[in-house]
Amino acid sequence: MTARILVVDDIPANVRLLEVRLLAEYFEVLTAGNGPDAIETCENGKVDVVLLDVMMPGMDGFEVCKRLKSDPATSHIPVVMITALDQVSDRVRGLEAGADDFLTKPVNDLQLMTRVKSLVRLKSLTDELRLRASTTRNIGIEELLSRNFATEDTKPKVLLVDERKSSIERIQKMLRGSADLDVATDPNAGFFQAAETAYECVLISTAFADFDALRLCSQLRSLDRTRFLPIMLLADEGEEGRIIRGLELGINDYLTRPIDQHELTARLRTQVRRKRYNDQLRASVT
């Protein structure tokens, strides 16, 4: 998978660090040292994902994001805000400005590549839907692309597979009002529940005492009915090996504990949009 990534930061060393990492994964990299240049690049070039630093002199990252998301010509480009580790307020402002995801400094390689690849896939689907909408004047596609996924009538149906009561209660609290959440405390029951219900995402905890969560991920990917169902892994710190194995098995994304509500909301929104776009594309060719 390759794509054109725009890195926006006023500190050249930060730009170079991200550029080297992305080039190593065969992405094409564009750079901008300030907000106006970033906006101009998005308007003039085929940018697939923007990595945008929050703290920049003059026009900061929030204003850049807000302008990109308010312009119909650039609103479909995914924006990842790069924030300081302890600045929860930055994530709130980023969501309000329209950011699609967050990365915290220092940026972890696994997180960087997972977020970028996830959003590149979403951008590819968005481009395909935009093309079909422009050539066929398909009203259903246009409505899907413009829909706000936080509204009551489009609230996603999500399954959480977890056995720890405290963890379940935290996720329920985080997603209250933004998702229709079901819970399965037994992974085998969760498998059948996922197969029999029209979920738009499954959250799978790695913290089972006597069950390998990756087994469930593998089973869901092997079943025709759940092959394209987005899966997010909820892992503990230090489980990078399991996360990498999960990505190899086909999970779409992951979160590490302690889970941040804003990151969970943003990642879930990305996966739900991807699922709905995929469903629309498959329906349009049948």
Segments predicted by a language model, with ranges:
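C-terminal output helix
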Residues: 103, 107-116, 120, 255, ...
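Two-component/phosphorelay signaling modules centered on CheY-like receiver
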Residues: 12-30, 43-44, 165-188, 195
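Receiver (REC) domain active-site loop signature in two-component systems and cognate sites
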Residues: 56, 208
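CheY-like receiver
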Residues: 121-156, 160, 166, 273-286
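His-Asp phosphorelay/catalytic-motif detector in bacterial-type signaling
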Residues: 2, 46-48, 72-78, 198-200, ...
